[in-house]
Amino acid sequence: MAVPKKKTSKSKRNQRHAVWKAKAATAAQRALSIGKSVLSGRAQGFVYPVAEADDSES
């Protein structure tokens, strides 16, 4: 079984953690921005099913 030979330094651990947190913050910011544009009606790249199509089938 593969095991690390030496302990990872605190600085390397903190750097990896900071990269992970930065990626998560970027993804959260993008999701919030997309949500705001959808709610405000400014979204251009989304296609939504029309509710009237569901009513006509019944």
From Swiss-Prot:
NCBIfam families: rpmF_bact. Keywords: Ribonucleoprotein, Ribosomal protein. Belongs to the bacterial ribosomal protein bL32 family. One of its GO terms (biological process) is translation. This is Large ribosomal subunit protein bL32. PANTHER family: 50S RIBOSOMAL PROTEIN L32, CHLOROPLASTIC, LARGE RIBOSOMAL SUBUNIT PROTEIN BL32C. SUPFAM superfamilies: Zn-binding ribosomal proteins (SSF57829). GO terms for molecular function: structural constituent of ribosome. GO terms for cellular component: large ribosomal subunit.
